[in-house]
Amino acid sequence: MSSKGSVVLAYSGGLDTSCILVWLKEQGYDVIAYLANIGQKEDFEEARKKALKLGAKKVFIEDVSKEFVEEFIWPAVQSSALYEDRYLLGTSLARPCIARRQVEIAQREGAKYVSHGATGKGNDQVRFELTCYSLAPQIKVIAPWRMPEFYNRFKGRNDLMEYAKQHGIPIPVTPKSPWSMDENLMHISYEAGILENPKNQAPPGLYTKTQDPAKAPNSPDVLEIEFKKGVPVKVTNIKDGTTRTTSLELFMYLNEVAGKHGVGRIDIVENRFIGMKSRGIYETPAGTILYHAHLDIEAFTMDREVRKIKQGLGLKFAELVYTGFWHSPECEFVRHCIQKSQERVEGKVQVSVFKGQVYILGRESPLSLYNEELVSMNVQGDYEPIDATGFININSLRLKEYHRLQSKVTAK
């Protein structure tokens, strides 16, 4: 059979993408396996050997950890991005980072196709493909889990396991695996299996990135986090003097400290982009600390009315990231506006990390809008209390008129 061409497969080494690699070869494609190192615990050399053994023409293992932090996580920190008030977007942020490098490899290798193992029911298929089409409009995407010849053949995990046995694909898991996991620097997500019943509590052994808060140390770690333009540039542990200043090391250290204290666990039901609700359990240790610390320094340094507008932009940014529109013109516009809002977000925040919680202890900034003398109950300063009378009268006018009308309506 003549080759249909080369396809760059986003390969994880797990059951799905290992089977997809072999299946793509069956369909006549030359497969280039691409594995992104985005901070997950993985034996990358073992994954390389496995992909080559399964017939990959080439294997690329790309370390994108630093760019993931600086180009994706930092904008999320600046925006205080939360999807549906709770989700810090760990998976959502990783997908455009992974897919961007996948497209670069495809262009470099002259491959017309890219492929992924995302299911036809989830968000990741959208995130991967919108990135690919944005960066390489001519690219063709092979999405096996949306192709009848694939999903009719493999109706579930058991069928994949049987296919793996037939083709000598070494798989470390069994059909009884109780949930699926996805890990990167930002977080670990757990879903599917026994977690699909939203009433089922997460088993104690599920969590791998954070300590059980009840078993966490009995004394807190106090951290000082320094921000410039809304981005963390330095973290210092007040207890032992440990300091980190480079983006990747800083973020990894916060993961370590927060994980030790059980910070960053959530169990939620969220609305997927395609319309269904899903249950997800997430551990986001460093991201949780930075979310709270950044909120604090931002409130300390940013004008009230600017912050109201910025909060709306942050909500829109979270929605765009979650739904896969990282490379859209509207997301570029929102990111630019948020970055503008962060120009004066500078200073240091002290936080206590303890038993699953992050407590703000204090903050300082050379650009603070906080005026201690003006706000003091003991010093009058430039503020005339009598001026508040007119302020209240003007603001009460609308309320008086509204309730005057309501009284007339009620009387009728």
From Swiss-Prot:
Disulfide bonds: none annotated. InterPro entries: Arginosuc_syn_C, Arginosuc_syn_N, Arginosuc_synth, Arginosuc_synth_CS, Arginosuc_synth_type_1_subfam, AS_cat/multimer_dom_body, Rossmann-like_a/b/a_fold. Pathway: Amino-acid biosynthesis; L-arginine biosynthesis; L-arginine from L-ornithine and carbamoyl phosphate: step 2/3; Nitrogen metabolism; urea cycle; (N(omega)-L-arginino)succinate from L-aspartate and L-citrulline: step 1/1. One of its GO terms (cellular component) is cell body fiber. ATP binds at residues 10-18, 36, 115-123. GO terms for molecular function: amino acid binding; argininosuccinate synthase activity; ATP binding; identical protein binding; toxic substance binding. SUPFAM superfamilies: Adenine nucleotide alpha hydrolases-like, Argininosuccinate synthetase, C-terminal domain. The modification N6-acetyllysine is found at K112, K165, K176. Coiled coil: none annotated. Acetylated by CLOCK in a circadian manner which negatively regulates its enzyme activity. Deacetylated by histone deacetylases. The modification Phosphotyrosine is found at Y87, Y113. Keywords: Acetylation, Amino-acid biosynthesis, Arginine biosynthesis, ATP-binding, Cytoplasm, Ligase, Nucleotide-binding, Phosphoprotein, Urea cycle. The keyword Transmembrane helix does not apply. It comes from the Eukaryota. It is found in: Cytoplasm, Cytosol. The keyword ATP-binding applies. L-citrulline binds at Y87, S92, N123, R127, S180, S189, E270, Y282. Widely expressed. It catalyses: L-citrulline + L-aspartate + ATP = 2-(N(omega)-L-arginino)succinate + AMP + diphosphate + H(+). L-aspartate binds at T119, N123, D124. GO terms for biological process: acute-phase response; argininosuccinate metabolic process; aspartate metabolic process; cellular response to amine stimulus; cellular response to amino acid stimulus; cellular response to ammonium ion; cellular response to cAMP; cellular response to dexamethasone stimulus. Belongs to the argininosuccinate synthase family. Type 1 subfamily. Homotetramer. Interacts with NMRAL1. Interacts with CLOCK; in a circadian manner. Forms tissue-specific complexes with ASL, SLC7A1, HSP90AA1 and nitric oxide synthase NOS1, NOS2 or NOS3; the complex regulates cell-autonomous L-arginine synthesis and citrulline recycling while channeling extracellular L-arginine to nitric oxide synthesis pathway. HAMAP family: Arg_succ_synth_type1 (MF_00005). One of the enzymes of the urea cycle, the metabolic pathway transforming neurotoxic amonia produced by protein catabolism into inocuous urea in the liver of ureotelic animals. Catalyzes the formation of arginosuccinate from aspartate, citrulline and ATP and together with ASL it is responsible for the biosynthesis of arginine in most body tissues. This is Argininosuccinate synthase. The gene is Ass1.
